[in-house]
């Protein structure tokens, strides 16, 4: 650029020049790239430092001045003016550029001084000027440490000297003045004063609502949930709080501003009495409702308390450990309640739905008993003879346990003397008590037991030893008139808690409380709180608390009353509750009521019950009768046993066993939970004493009146185990307790409730196998037994003679009773008998016999052969239609038929046959002959005989007028001389050709059939078909099958082994591998349905019990004496009485 151009160029304005320099300075102050190391940075810095700041900053101005100097002196003045302006601007730019240079540090060195800067003199001057105003503030002179230390020590010495010179009171006063204004910390200092917390008229009100007592907490919770559920709804409930107080039962308190909100909150909640209204609590009563007075519980070792919760609720306990009382835990000692019910019984009780939470009795811990029930591993032995069981420690029979203090009650404990005596190990009232152990029991004597005139003494406090007569009684203070000492005759007030009653030896007193209530006697000894007196009546010593005594006035009436009662007498506590006297203690009767609760009552509180021990009877769990004097035992629970000494309403049985100490050996049990210790015979047949069933009518002809309904003996069904098959209770198991018409009252097993169920909805339940069978009723074939029928016709059979085994051979063929072979026999089985039933069968004709017509022969109430009778199934000779024809004797269910002219086409099932071609008969070429093995029941009572040609051959001429009255023509009679071949025990000849009664021919008696197996003894006894599978090493007999619904042949190997005896030891499925006793080389695999037990026939035989109750089933005994079909067994160790077993329940042992 030339000088002319420079000169002609106008000078730049200061603002533009400043802006340009500012931009140039910003460019120079750019951030250094991190890749550029210290070398580049150092070079730049050194160059900047070597330059003069003025030259650097005014580089452009300097060049202009140099050029201006060369121009000449004409422009000198103008240049000087410009230089002055430029210098001012340069001075301003110097500071900006200097600051820019200092800010050119890297970001990572913002807080580190990593380079040294060389300041020039101008900067030093500037810094001096910057700190000029504070230059005198810091003393830079070095500090004299020694002088300062000496000064402080002298000051400390002056303080010590001054303290020594000052008086102590001055120091205290000065300290008080110094700290008088300091606020001492107080826990309640931040609390608002109580007067400011009192509610006012602007605060929410408190409303009182009456509720059901005991449900206060539940109702409060319901209100909480209701308010919370509606708080975000369109209509929230404006309730602020709700609470209840345990000390105010039956009320809750709700805080709200309006009563409408309270009504909305409680509306619809169960347990609130809205009829009482919603009441406003006054303002002055609101604050006391929220105050809680804390009670300090003072527990000391040896103190008596009572448990509040669990199965031990109400039990007395003693404090033994208070070391952890600060943690809210106290150690106590009490008598445990351990359930000693056998494990199997507990499982059965749970399986049938009975409650398992039965409260066991309180008894001391016995290691052997617990180990027997729960096993050895459940009990561990601890230190010093203690035991650990179920996480609890037991010492000397007592349970030692740590419980929370709220779990025990410390007030109103009032332990009785008998409760405390159990802690001493003796429950006898005459026992020697440890007085120190019961010293606290009588400490707090209630003032309600004190009356003016009582003698008392002070036993603790400053007035210990003072005694006198009570003059006035108040809740906490008692005024007495002192006797003896310095205050004799003066009235002295003493604390009520420090006094006790005082009695003198020889004084006559009466007991007010405890188990000896109303007893009276003379004081013979006084030791502290225990007074010993001699009873007026029992002449025995009684120990009672002094607080329970009072001076007696009159006992004459009591003496007369006590003579009315004796031990084990039954008394009535009220109109529905009975009990027995367990002990007579002076003026008190110890009673055990029907619910098992022991009570102590006075004779005036009970009434004696008429003695009915001779007539009292009940039914046990197996349906057997029990009476006074029988030895019974429980079937569940504690399995106690004892002798029956009284029975109440045939339900509650009172028993006595002197080995039991509780309640002096007396306990009570329900009759249906007992079983006889000694075996008993089957239940008696009450139909034998029913005159309606045994009524006999004189001879007479048949009647066309309708047959009367059978009188079913349904009492046989009582105590039968059944299962409900229909209705809402389907599947439930129970026991029939009563039969009323067509309904039965069934007591369910799982909850002991009684339901009324129709008999058609019940089925019998086998206790052993669990199988179900129809109930056996009168008038049906299953009641009579027979082939294919369930062998349950023993205990519950309506007709005990139906399908019975043939009579003994010595009795001959009998029709139908045990009076020899004659018809009629002493009005038994007479012909005709229109009203006879049961054993009075074999009648010709009989229009009213249990709805099945006259029968010849007949068994039980089945439809035997009938000639003639009423109804479609009656005996008809001949009959029109019905395919039944006249029947003589029975053909299956319809009987054998005398030729019927109107029968079905040949060869029809109703062909006339005389005698019948039985259901199990087979044709024989020789014609009719007696049966070799006659089936036992009516449906199969025909013998094995040759059939008379069936069809229309040899028909008896019929009169078609009235088919039911057409007589058999005289010219074609049923053979007169030939006897009717019938069943072994109940057979009768066919009536002969006469108008009267056909006698039984003496020359041709009713033939005696061989032994029948259809309804054998084990069927009557109720043995199942598979009984043999439960036993081994027994002797059995072979006979026809009696398994219900069996598809096997009737006889095993066509009857080849019938009547043979086998012995077996091996069981294969439902078969046994048996060896023939007559020929041991014969080994057969026989199904169990063909096996009968071999009966005992002489004494000295070893047998096993295969039937009866569970207490005797499976026992192996030796026969000793037989009487009436029952065997008495030889006594064995532990037998209380001889064992008598029915012969049908015995089976001989094979290999002894």
Swiss-Prot record:
| Molecular functions per Gene Ontology | mRNA binding
Alphabetized CDD domains for the sequence: KOW_Spt5_1 (cd06081), KOW_Spt5_2 (cd06082), KOW_Spt5_3 (cd06083), KOW_Spt5_4 (cd06084), KOW_Spt5_5 (cd06085), NGN_Euk (cd09888)
Specify where the region named Disordered lies, as residue ranges: 1-104, 906-966
The GO biological-process annotations, alphabetized, read as: mRNA processing; regulation of DNA-templated transcription elongation; regulation of transcription by RNA polymerase II; transcription elongation by RNA polymerase II
Keyword tRNA processing listed? The answer is: no
Q: Where are stretches of biased composition, namely Acidic residues?
A: 34-60, 68-95
Q: What is its main location?
A: nucleus
Specify residue ranges for compositional bias: Low complexity. Answer: 939-966
Cellular compartments annotated: Nucleus
Alphabetical UniProt keywords: mRNA processing, Nucleus, Transcription
* Gene3D superfamilies per the UniProt record, alphabetical: 2.30.30.30, NusG, N-terminal domain
* Pfam families named in the record: CTD, KOW1_SPT5, KOW2_Spt5, KOW4_SPT5, KOW5_SPT5, KOWx_SPT5, Spt5-NGN, Spt5_N
What SMART domains does the entry give? Answer: CTD, KOW
What does the UniProt function comment say about this protein? Answer: The SPT4-SPT5 complex mediates both activation and inhibition of transcription elongation, and plays a role in pre-mRNA processing. This complex seems to be important for the stability of the RNA polymerase II elongation machinery on the chromatin template but not for the inherent ability of this machinery to translocate down the gene.
Which family, according to UniProt?
Belongs to the SPT5 family.
Q: What is this protein called?
A: Transcription elongation factor SPT5
Originating species: Cryptococcus neoformans var. neoformans serotype D (strain JEC21 / ATCC MYA-565) (Filobasidiella neoformans)
